[in-house]
């Protein structure tokens, strides 16, 4: 629900990056919803460029391309302003699981790197956008509890003054802790025909004190799994008479994620072809948008984006 979404970009890229990299990152950011760019950095003293690259008319590499780049970005974000995202998938932001794991004590990892070992929401988001070409929206669990969201005919509906979005699938990233009130809303979504895909680790503890048994009961009612016991080694599924479906994938990969989404949302509102399915010369397609294939990051490094 952000009409303007800003992002600082290009900071700490190689000093000798070419002008085409300006466009590559711009396209990646726009595909992810950014419509306000803050290029880094425009140094007043070209002899004191502490963090490359220099993005200004003084740069011999980038300076000649900046006027066309500025026109391109200006036109593109003008088209994106005021638009409405159309996507079938909501991805729950696992803030309660991240917060429950973190501790302020000597010996713990640096701030931003202290994440639970099962943490996978950044991996899921990278696969969805960069490789599976499935658009999605992060949903904050506290907002999900309120009146911004409602459930109608198997859809989770976000309806505000700025936008309206209707989700048919809610993905739960791995995590042991969740708000009981959030899980109640998720159960309502399932009971009214919604589709749920859980990955890696089901919640077993409540973000609120003294309500763990409610979490256990709700997870059992949705997935038919007791989360206090070891997670099932194989994929499990559940369904109800209202059309609700829930799938738990214990060891999620790109392929198991793609397959599960196809089962739960067989006819998406928008379908973007996979690179492998596009009928074009291989050398014209380039690589996937995602960072994980070319730059494998540890869970700790991925946690820096939390």
Language-model segment annotations:
Residues 1-306:
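Carbohydrate-binding surfaces of carbohydrate-active enzymes
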């Amino acid at each position: 629900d952000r009409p303007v979404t800003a992002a600082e970009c290009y900071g700490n890229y190689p000093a000798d990056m070419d002008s085409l990299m300006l466009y590559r990152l711009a396209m990646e950011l726009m595909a992810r919803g950014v419509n306000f760019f803050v290029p880094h950095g425009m140094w007043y003293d070209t002899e004191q460029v502490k963090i490359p690259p220099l993005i200004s008319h003084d740069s011999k590499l980038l300076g000649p391309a900046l006027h066309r780049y500025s026109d391109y970005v200006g036109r593109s974000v003008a088209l994106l302003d005021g638009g409405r995202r159309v996507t079938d998938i909501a991805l729950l932001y696992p803030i309660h699981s991240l917060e429950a794991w973190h501790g302020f004590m000597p010996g713990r990892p640096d701030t931003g790197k202290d994440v639970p070992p099962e943490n996978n929401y950044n991996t899921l988001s990278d696969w969805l956008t960069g490789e599976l070409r499935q658009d999605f929206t992060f949903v904050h669990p506290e907002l999900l509890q309120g009146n911004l969201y409602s459930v109608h005919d198997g859809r989770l509906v976000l309806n505000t003054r700025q936008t309206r979005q209707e989700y048919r699938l809610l993905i739960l990233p791995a995590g042991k802790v969740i708000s009981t009130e959030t899980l109640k809303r998720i159960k309502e979504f399932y009971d009214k025909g919604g589709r749920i895909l859980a990955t890696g680790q089901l919640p077993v503890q409540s973000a609120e004190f003294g309500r763990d048994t409610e979490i256990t009961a709700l997870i059992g009612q949705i997935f038919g799994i007791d989360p206090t016991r070891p997670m099932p080694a194989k994929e499990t599924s559940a369904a109800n008479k209202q059309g609700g479906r829930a799938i738990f994938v214990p060891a999620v990969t790109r392929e198991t994620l793609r397959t599960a989404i196809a089962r739960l949302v067989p006819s998406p509102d928008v379908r973007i072809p996979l690179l492998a399915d596009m009928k074009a010369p291989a050398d014209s397609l380039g690589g996937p948008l995602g960072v994980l294939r070319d730059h494998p990051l540890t869970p700790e490094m991925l946690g820096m984006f939390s």
